[in-house]
A protein has these predicted regions:
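Substrate-binding pocket helix/loop in short-chain dehydrogenase/reductase
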Residues: 122-124, 128-133, 227
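Canonical Rossmann dinucleotide-binding motif of NAD(H)/NADP(H)-dependent dehydrogenases/reductases
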Residues: 18-58
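Alpha-helical segment proximal to the catalytic Tyr-Lys
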Residues: 152, 195-199, 255
Length: 304
């Protein structure tokens, strides 16, 4: 084995290439199955995919029933999952959920702050303050509390990965109000945590999600077509498209990446409204935009 291959081998460790997260233990928030099943949420997809890649996964959700539904999917596929339920914006609930996860999994290596609410948009003169405050509590306070209670366990594990889920609404004006402000805050916190806890070998990174077809997004066909036209690829993503980059950021493959914002948006933020307008007037036809997302991609099986 030459020097380069030996170095690469030391970086890869003993991980099975088909199980990139073997031995990892992850706490994923907002990972319950959406009411009624069907369209897959981002947290659910991340939890299921992490487990399929060899991680033990704690599925955290405000609903015990929804968390248990995701764990059933994980366990039925031969993975290791445990459900924890509570309001993660409550310090007491958050601390309890993290401790339950640690007891069940034997520790933590990875945290995914995904739980979020939309709402609180519009003019400051008319916005519902109760909605605004609830969005900020769930989207920002819950992430901070999860990090607060999980970081000591990541330290105990010798380091780990914090993956925060943000949105292009953080940097593009979409009229999203509190949601946009909360996601901008998440990106700022990501950089701070990367700075403060790098000495603990804890990495913090952010996935910045574009126009994905999820329960939280636009689901009517006209809206979906507008969103496809708003990307450079002429397509919309699904939850798996966010879950795969999360696997990378949780794995040792990303061991030298911290403090980064990773856009997963089909190029939506790589250009301007004028660039998109020019692209769509250049002869790109509906047939070149890619097919509508078939029902099979909202199933519970990771796409490859």
């Amino acid at each position: 084995m030459d020097r380069v291959e030996a170095d690469n081998q030391s970086r890869r460790g003993d991980a099975d290439p088909g199980h990139r997260l073997s031995g990892k233990r992850a706490f994923v928030t907002g990972a319950g199955t959406a009411p009624g099943g069907g369209l897959l949420g981002i947290g659910e997809a991340i939890a299921v995919l992490f487990a399929s890649q060899g991680a033990g996964v704690a599925v955290a959700d405000v609903s015990a029933e929804r968390a248990a539904a995701t764990v059933s999917l994980i366990n039925d596929a031969g993975g290791e999952g445990v459900a924890v339920a509570g309001d993660l914006s409550s310090e007491a609930d958050n601390a309890r959920c993290v401790e339950e996860a640690v007891r069940a999994l034997g520790g933590l290596d990875t945290v995914v702050n995904n739980v979020a609410l939309s709402g609180g948009g519009g003019s400051p003169t008319t916005v519902d303050l109760d909605v605004w405050e609830r969005v900020m509590a769930v989207n920002v306070r819950a992430a901070m509390l999860t990090a607060r209670h999980a970081i000591p366990h990541l330290r105990h594990s010798g380091g780990g990965s914090i993956i925060n889920i943000s949105s292009i609404a953080a940097t593009r004006a979409l009229g999203a109000g509190a949601y946009a402000a909360s996601k901008a805050a998440i990106q700022a916190l990501t950089r701070d945590w990367a700075l403060i806890h790098g000495q603990d070998r804890i990495r913090a990174n952010c996935i910045v999600v574009g126009h994905a077809y999820t329960p939280m997004g636009v689901t009517d066909e006209a809206g979906r077509e507008r969103r496809r036209l708003a990307s450079l690829l002429g397509t919309e993503g699904v939850a798996w498209d966010i879950a795969w980059p999360a696997v990378f950021l949780a794995s040792d493959e990303s061991r030298w990446i911290s403090g980064a914002d990773l856009p997963v948006d089909a190029g939506a933020t790589a250009t301007t409204a004028l660039g998109i307008h020019t692209l769509n007037r250049s002869g790109r036809t509906d047939g070149e935009l890619g097919p509508s997302i078939p029902p099979s991609t909202s199933s519970t099986s990771p796409v490859t």
